[in-house]
Amino acid sequence: MLETERDNIRKHFLKYTRQAFQGLPKMESPHILDVGCGSGIPTIELAKLSGGQVTGIDVDQSQLSILNERIVEEGLSRRVFVRNCSLFDIDFPDETFDVIWAEGSLHIVGFEKGLKEWRHLLKSGGFLVAHDGIKDVSSKLDRVPVLGYKLVTHFALPEDTWQTKYFEPLEQLIQKWRNKAKTPETLSLLESYQNEVNMYKMNPKENVSAFYIFQKT
């Protein structure tokens, strides 16, 4: 299945998910919100790392359906939950979560908007972990205290990570499937993947990213 093979490429980034998680203090059975979870590559990993409860939210029901299948396969039905929910209107009670995890979703919502609007969802002293670009990072981090957080730590991914671990393998995957793709759905996926690659090639230096750990103050 094409989407499964693409997700296998995305698993190259789990080493950085694990590294970021190790930057958090030890918590017993934390409640984690995975914002923009997609098909749940980090979601499942977070459940295994934390031993706690993970709620994944996204608006793409097809991706959530894949995640639901993975939850059953991994035997995590009592600890991992999904909800079809907009990233711009997250409807949970105040102070529900110990950790908010955002791998790529701040890029969609906006750095300042995400930190500001998601803050009330965190318990006192809770953490927001974000995988985001490093463009304008100094000005972004200057705003963090004003938004009600402090920076705990951050680390950048190696500069060639996106090229060697994602876009080059993705391009190889596209070539592999191009001649055997038959269904409109598969052809549409291939087109979307190719668009990703094309956008990357237009400005590869934009695809340098880092993990940030913020604590609610």
For each feature predicted by the language model, list its residue ranges:
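Class I SAM-dependent methyltransferase Rossmann-like catalytic core
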Residues: 1-12
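Conserved alpha-helix/loop element of class I SAM-dependent methyltransferases that forms part
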Residues: 10-28
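Class I SAM-dependent methyltransferase SAM/SAH-binding core
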Residues: 33, 39-89
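A short acidic, Gly/Pro-enriched loop at the edge of an enzyme's catalytic core
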Residues: 88-99
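A short SAM/SAH-binding and catalytic strip from SAM-dependent methyltransferases
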Residues: 99-112
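A short glycine-rich, Lys/Arg-flanked "PGG" loop and its adjoining helix->strand segment in the class I
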Residues: 112-127
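Conserved Class I S-adenosyl-L-methionine
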Residues: 158-217
